């Protein structure tokens, strides 16, 4: 029987698979994977995923649904996602508030224009996807470097989408920090403007300091102290939510990542410690 409570998670990456399979029970509360990277995967990787899914709850963070795209939603792909989520009893499914296809796959997460028209477009697609998947979706605030056309602020856009789509928010704390530095707004004021009830999970990750006013979200380094401080503020405002440490590149030994997940757990305990059900 899997534990009913989630707090501290780690991204499931193929490069970590041998160490994750040997990881002690309770080292983390859950693992998060991108379903696109594991659907129909067999062999040693498929067996490894099946073994981990028996030992740890699995959550999913999608990469290619392209909720903001202009092409029709891919219903066959959504069927595959739903089957994967059902097979592994996934309780939390999230996707990026972005688009990644336009007459082909772009292999990047592009920001959606901050307009009323875009709000209506993406909210309708989220509602249809939620209906097809028979579960709620948490959309993630993305990092972006070239600001899209904006008739409203990023905060106003996110709030409008959450309201019209009636979906949840995966709050990426590092992305808030990166965008605040790059686009000149206050990260804490941004968090204060988000609706508490919509935040159901969080991400935290490292970034690269290209310049004092240019941060790059890399997922390739340890979490920086300024981001830890912003995460503490997020816990204070939104309560303890399932939080994933993301690390995609320059993977260190698992023990180093578990030092960071232990810090997440300690901070969660200091901000109320009531686990998320």
Curated annotation (Swiss-Prot):
Transmembrane segments: none annotated. InterPro entries: MbnB/TglH/ChrH, Xyl_isomerase-like_sf. It comes from the Bacteria. Belongs to the UPF0276 family. This is UPF0276 protein PputGB1_2003. The lineage of its organism: Bacteria, Pseudomonadati, Pseudomonadota, Gammaproteobacteria, Pseudomonadales.
